[in-house]
């Protein structure tokens, strides 16, 4: 998923040797928990920033919800057709997909703000900063230490 790709980016961008090992050997795997633990230990102010944004809670909830659907733990949530002849778009399913995608995008946005965003913040244009901070309350922006200028 885009969220997993984003998680891996935040880790492997500074771990090229581990990435090379992963390419050579499928036995080497870094999971979501290991990446979050890495950020807690090594990304400056990650704990404070993720708490301000509710990142880990939202990430775990999104991951659990999507996993439940993917692994069939919510039967009927995505499939309402009884035969191929009746396959057609279903409004309720589309809403679930769109809402899940939007939440995943928001979680990824917050992940980037807590990790690589802070590192590269001074290189972003004023317009980019405005877009990245859109919708965040002033007190949260202050806690994150991310200016709009």
Segments the model singles out, each with a brief description of its role:
Residues 4-149:
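A cross-kingdom marker of C-terminal helix-rich interaction/assembly modules
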């Amino acid at each position: 998923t885009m969220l997993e790709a984003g998680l891996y980016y935040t880790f492997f961008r500074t771990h090229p040797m581990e990435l090379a090992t992963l390419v050579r050997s499928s036995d080497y795997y870094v999971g979501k928990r290991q990446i979050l633990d890495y950020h807690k230990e090594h990304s400056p102010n990650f704990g404070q920033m993720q708490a301000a944004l509710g990142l880990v809670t939202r990430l775990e909830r999104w991951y659990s919800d999507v996993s439940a659907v993917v692994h069939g733990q919510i039967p009927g949530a995505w499939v309402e057709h009884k035969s191929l002849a009746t396959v057609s778009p279903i409004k309720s399913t589309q809403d679930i997909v769109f809402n899940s995608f939007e939440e995943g995008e928001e979680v990824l946005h917050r992940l980037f703000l807590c990790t690589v965003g802070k590192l590269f913040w001074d290189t972003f244009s004023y317009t980019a900063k405005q877009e990245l901070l859109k919708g965040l309350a002033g007190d949260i922006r202050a806690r994150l230490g991310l200016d709009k200028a």
